[in-house]
Amino acid sequence: YHDPVESHLARNIHTYGPIPVAVDSTSRAFDLYHDGILQKEHCGNDVDHAVLVVGYTPEYWIVKNSWGSHWGQNGYIYIERGRNACGIDTYASFATQVSI
């Protein structure tokens, strides 16, 4: 499986730092997340919530949420990579260099 959006997202995080994205936060699994890797099967793709991807491993994105340190793993969630889990690849925002 190769997702060009995911490749760009990983490359830009590596080069420039954290990237804002949108995710589907409506699932019970997302709402009650406390550890592990949130898999695609446990969340939808109807994005409704902004979060910040701060890093990644080959298996998951490291995502900072705005719901405070009491939620998730001290305010973070690990979301499965490679399958657009929770719609994470849908609305990634990162800058590109433009020549003027």
Where are these regions (language model features)?
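Predominantly the structural core of cysteine protease catalytic domains
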Residues: 1-62, 69-100
